Design a protein with these regions (language model features):
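Bacterial Sec-dependent N-terminal signal peptides
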Residues: 1-50
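Alpha/propeptide regions of enzymes that mature by internal proteolysis
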Residues: 36-367
Length: 367
């Protein structure tokens, strides 16, 4: 099933204050009701004809325990509108002849600024009550890449990752060094208080209290290793194909709630959370990062296509629903191939996601 979405009028802007999340979501939706949209929440992309489309775009806002019965109508509406708005950012760039890289960077930037998602403004808190942000971006035409990890005062980590790719001889910068590079290259830096959201803070406090009660004073250290305790793998990502046949991918995250020791997941790791090459596909992942790193998930999809000749659908499905499941990994990915085919597989209860091609546009949450 396909449909052409009508253009969204007005500038949509996420905001967050100190009130309860239910009140915020109602206010958030009130601002957005003036925007026309035409969205559906169930569908899978249709395989394209051999003719490559003018563009293709896919996004995600994280995967995990996302259940319809736990989602209020207001909250679901807010997520759907946010996803559709993000699609509009990237699709507008691609429709006007822009590059896949620019579409990816700008789309992820918008998602970073929306507090509904665990990236940028909506980032979760570390064990110490800080926000540590990670991001990566990759150009399928040149296979150049840029990544940053554990930055705390950079408003949009994806823009810093792009600068690392374009303005340095390196691929991966972290911590204070990455922040210094941001300052030297005009990347916007901001008071870390800007990242504070009451909902994320309350989740951390609840988690700390539960660990203390269950595992003692050093609860975090005594807790057995396992899956993300809140059941969600918050990440945002975008993959794109432009009119010139170039691919790009980008991913950004606040990481895992209650993380310690500058823990990094797959999002900033090229080949694990992000990968792009014009000869096959562009991939952005979301899930239990340790598993995605161990099994080089994003690169694995590309390798199955490049070396074994699998289709995008077959390669991504095998990695997510067979290999990861067998290894105990949970999550999903978005991917687009050189012909404009799109795949959005996940093995969790839900994944915030959407995609757009000429005459076709959808956003989805549940299975």
């Amino acid at each position: 099933m396909t449909f052409a979405s009508r253009p969204i009028r007005g500038k949509i802007q996420c905001f967050f204050g100190m009130k309860k999340i239910s009140v915020l979501l109602i206010a958030f939706i009130a601002v957005l009701f003036s925007c026309e949209n035409n969205m559906q929440t169930t569908a899978t992309p249709q395989k394209l004809s051999p003719e490559r489309p003018a563009y293709a775009l896919a996004i995600h806002g994280g995967a995990g325990t996302i259940l319809r019965e736990e989602m209020t109508p207001e909250k679901e509406k807010a997520y759907n509108i946010a996803l559709d708005s993000a699609l509009t950012i990237g699709e507008t760039i691609l429709k006007n002849g822009g590059t896949a890289l620019d579409a990816v960077e700008q789309t992820v930037t918008w998602l970073e600024n929306c507090p509904l998602f665990n990236a940028g403004r909506g980032a979760v808190f570390t064990h110490e009550g800080k926000n540590e942000l990670d991001a990566s971006i990759m150009d399928g035409a040149t296979q150049k890449a840029g990544a940053v990890g554990s930055v705390m005062n950079v408003k949009n980590p994806i823009r810093l990752a792009r600068a690392v790719m374009d303005k340095s001889p390196h691929v991966f910068l972290t911590g204070r060094g990455a922040e210094q590079f941001a300052a030297e290259n005009g990347i916007e830096q901001i008071d870390p208080k800007w990242f504070f959201t009451r909902e994320r803070w309350d989740v951390l406090q609840q988690m700390l209290q539960e660990e203390k009660e269950k595992y003692g004073k050093q609860g975090w250290l005594n807790k057995p290793a396992g899956k993300n305790p809140d059941g969600k793998f918050g990440t945002v990502g975008c993959v794109a194909l432009d009119k010139n046949g170039n691919l790009a991918a980008g991913t950004s995250t606040g990481g895992m709630t209650n993380k310690r020791w500058n823990r990094l997941g797959d999002s900033p790791v090229i080949g694990a959370g992000t990968y792009a090459s014009n000869d096959a596909c562009a991939v952005s992942c979301t899930g239990h990062g340790e598993f995605f790193i161990r099994y080089a998930v994003a690169h694995d999809v590309w390798a199955l296509m490049a070396y074994k000749g699998l289709s995008l659908e077959a390669a991504s499905d095998w990695v997510v629903n067979k290999k990861l499941v067998e290894k105990g990994g949970e999550g999903g990915l978005i991917a687009v191939d050189k012909d404009g085919n799109i795949a959005l597989p996940f093995n969790s209860a839900g994944m915030y996601r959407g995609y757009a091609r000429p005459g076709e546009r959808k956003v989805m949450i549940y299975k």
